[in-house]
Amino acid sequence: MLEVVTSPSLATSSDWSEHGAAVGTLSDREGIAKSAALSVPQLFVKSHPRVPPGQSSTAMAAYGQTQYSTGIQQAPPYTAYPTPAQAYGIPPYSIKTEDSLNHSPSQSGFLSYGPSFSTAPAGQSPYTYPVHSTAGLYQGANGLTNTAGFGSVHQDYPSYPSFSQNQYPQYFSPSYNPPYVPASSLCSSPLSTSTYVLQEAPHNVPSQSSESLAGDYNTHNGPSTPAKEGDTERPHRASDGKLRGRSKRNSDPSPAGDNEIERVFVWDLDETIIIFHSLLTGTFASRYGKDTTTSVRIGLMMEEMIFNLADTHLFFNDLEDCDQIHVDDVSSDDNGQDLSTYNFSTDGFHSTAPGASLCLGTGVHGGVDWMRKLAFRYRRVKEMYNTYRNNVGGLIGAPKRETWLQLRAELEALTDLWLTHSLKALNLINSRPNCVNVLVTTTQLIPALAKVLLYGLGSVFPIENIYSATKTGKESCFERIMQRFGRKAVYIVIGDGVEEEQGAKKHNMPFWRISCHADLEALRHALELEYL
């Protein structure tokens, strides 16, 4: 007769559940399958028919007592291990969520180590890891905790020693600045408001090379937008956006057009970017406490160089009475003739138009041949400007170049680096891909081009972006500029006079007044912060 004996491992005592959990954990953590196999209870035990039941009682303990195999000892009471104060030395990566906010401002870098690896207790220590959800980045803790302490008897592998930081070389040099602000540097107190004081710049000007000062302020050497570089003559449309006659000269098309410009900065020239007229009158010297005699002397020397350049290289004697608003206004009358061997002094331009009465207010003349000769001159002016816009010294020659460099240095010292501050703002705008500088001045077009070249502004003002408001006024020039770049662009007017302010107000353009050095510094600061 078979005798069914209930194994002691099925006792109702809680020791079995605890012991099974410990063994299961050991099997998962240490990979000891043998110990787990030994703990499987034998539900049915078949007694040998020849062995009396009394003999088996000597091998079995009394009912209700806990029985363990020889390979597994009773687990000691559970030991609660505190979470280490220092987690592993891999900080949570900054995960950019859909709300475009960095939820880990305390990250010190992409790769960093803690001071050392904390010594882990027996078993697996808890570790933290970032959990990404729709609400952001959270710091969660893994649920792996030590369930029981195991001695060396239960481990197939020896314990691992702790590692120090000194074994590993740094990925970055000590001078590496992390891209994020560490948590220790974050200020817990409210931020205080700082007052910025504009310090007066030194009056000395560093020595420049013989080829500098013409374009050394230009910090942008990359390709420019067509409104900056390649907005030349177009076969069907003039630069002001109005339909004109088809020109026979075809320039290479630019990859982008004027309608792609997003922001247009319309500048005044005198007393805004440069100091010129107030030097001649002594107004600048009296306002800033400078020597009036020196101011007038520098102003007269600069005026002489401006008109000398305009007469010698830019046909000002021929074009003074036939002034244009824009250099391309008469390009439709140009037949594209090669001018490399053309003799401007003997083409009969003066004999055809001996008096100013033959040149109307808009530069239009009744004769087609005379208009073609006029267009030839403006085309040569454009070629000269584009060739020497960054090398004025090569245009005026070596003897005059030294005088020009010395005059520029004296001018900067007298005006407290006014032009240097202006060029900082101009170069910031010029470096943007979809922004452009446009110049509108009350000076005649040819002298205005000479001013731009001699003051070293050719790198930030292409000749296509220079307008003369001598005859029509600045408001009319603003309208032409808006027709050229479109209504979608944002226009910002920068100047010092009432005329540009009223024109900007009429066309709902923001106006930035320049009256002192602080205004130029504030403009540059606003551009750096991309407020403009």
Curated annotation (Swiss-Prot):
Residues 205-224 have a biased composition (Polar residues). Disruption phenotype: No visible phenotype. In contrast, mice lacking both Eya1 and Eya2 display complete embryonic lethality, due to severe defects in muscle development, including the absence of the diaphragm, the absence of ventral hypaxial muscles of the trunk and muscles in forelimbs and hindlimbs, similar to the phenotype of mice lacking both Six1 and Six4. While Six1 is normally expressed in these mice, it does not activate transcription from cognate promoter elements, and does not activate transcription of Pax3. It is found in: Cytoplasm; Nucleus. Residues 202-258 are annotated as: Disordered. SUPFAM superfamilies: HAD-like. Extensively expressed in cranial placodes, branchial arches, CNS and developing eye and nose. Low expression in lung with little or no expression in skin, liver, intestine and kidney. Predominantly expressed in the upper one-third of the oxyntic mucosa and in most regions of the pyloric mucosa. GO terms for molecular function: histone H2AXY142 phosphatase activity; magnesium ion binding; protein tyrosine phosphatase activity. The active site is at D268 (nucleophile), D270 (proton donor). Belongs to the HAD-like hydrolase superfamily. EYA family. NCBIfam families: EYA-cons_domain. This is Protein phosphatase EYA2. It comes from Mus musculus (Mouse).
